[in-house]
């Protein structure tokens, strides 16, 4: 969701069919000094049975009192709703932005990735939260690919039953169904995974259709059956960096031009996964490496310089 109002609207965001949320703002002397959400994803509770409620959209000045007050408000809202722990930030849940950035502030924000103020991690810990998990973002910019991965790619390309085909934007309903099936299979059992529901995938496809570059988004098929996917997107943040957040009236047209004609040099590798049935087969043991090589080759050939 690129429109924050729509993202937080129960009428427009399919999340609210599976969850509920409340939004908090903090004020001091009539000045806005912070914000935070609290939310419950009932699908997460059904899958993981871990009693976790979430907080998210956490942003404050460097002020421990404000941070404590916001996080305490989120916890107080969650407590009577039969959850035993608070985890976050999730904005709004695990299929969207997750975590607080604690390293890498020298790089500009990447689309659909958390980007926090440098002090926010320390504020959360000072307010009493403890680290749940490290999440790593990898930056790749070297066209000299590892020989072992290239060999895997070469072997996969020789397999007559394997096809790596671009996403077909003219048949997005079909492609959306395929992506949902692969995602729910390939990510099942992973940390904080929750199945993507049809309405959520449809909404995501609507949001992303205008920026998808089919040259760097592809599906792996084995004997005509979807086996894996790699969805890499042009970095929208790079395209709108000088628009000061104003897409209307002319900013949106500028962004689309920069994405489609004068495309960015950076990309976001949003999803890469392989269905379990193919991960278990020795013959396709190199498919994952091959898909990384394929994505890199496609990206560099199109003029992109780096990916996260």
Identify the role of each PLM range.
Residues 87, 139, 219-221, 231, ...:
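Short beta-strand segments
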Residues 141-163, 192-200, 255-260, 286-294, ...:
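Short flexible/disordered coil segments
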Residues 19, 31, 48, 130-133, ...:
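A generic structural signal for short, non-catalytic loop/turn and secondary-structure boundary residues
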Residues 47-128, 133, 243-308:
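Acyl-donor binding region in acyl/amide transferases
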């Amino acid at each position: 969701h690129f429109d924050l109002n729509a993202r937080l609207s129960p009428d427009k965001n399919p999340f609210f069919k599976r969850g509920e949320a409340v939004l908090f703002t903090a004020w001091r002397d009539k000045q806005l000094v912070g914000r935070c959400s609290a939310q419950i994803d009932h699908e997460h509770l059904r899958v993981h049975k871990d009693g976790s409620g979430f907080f998210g959209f956490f942003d404050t000045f460097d002020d421990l009192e404000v941070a404590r007050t916001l996080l305490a408000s989120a916890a107080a809202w969650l407590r009577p709703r039969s959850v035993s722990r608070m985890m976050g930030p999730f904005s709004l849940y695990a299929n969207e932005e997750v975590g607080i950035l604690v390293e890498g502030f020298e790089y500009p924000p990447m689309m659909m990735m958390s980007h926090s103020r440098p002090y926010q991690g320390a504020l959360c810990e000072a307010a009493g939260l403890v680290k749940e998990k490290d999440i790593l973002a990898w930056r790749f910019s070297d066209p000299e690919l590892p020989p072992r991965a290239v060999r895997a790619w070469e072997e996969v390309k020789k397999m007559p039953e394997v096809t790596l085909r671009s996403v077909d934007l003219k048949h997005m309903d079909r492609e959306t169904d395929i992506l949902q099936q692969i995602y729910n299979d390939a990510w099942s059992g992973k940390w904080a995974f929750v199945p993507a529901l049809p309405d959520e995938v449809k909404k995501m496809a609507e949001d992303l259709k205008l920026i998808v570059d089919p040259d760097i988004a592809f599906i792996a098929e084995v004997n005509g059956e979807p086996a894996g996917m790699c969805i890499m997107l042009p970095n929208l943040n790079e395209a709108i960096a000088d628009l000061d957040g104003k897409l209307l009236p002319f900013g949106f047209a500028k962004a689309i031009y920069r994405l489609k004609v004068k495309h960015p040099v950076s990309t976001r590798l949003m999803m890469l996964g392989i269905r379990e049935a193919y991960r278990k087969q020795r013959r396709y043991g190199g498919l994952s490496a091959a898909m990384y090589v394929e994505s890199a080759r496609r990206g560099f050939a199109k003029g992109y310089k780096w990916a996260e």
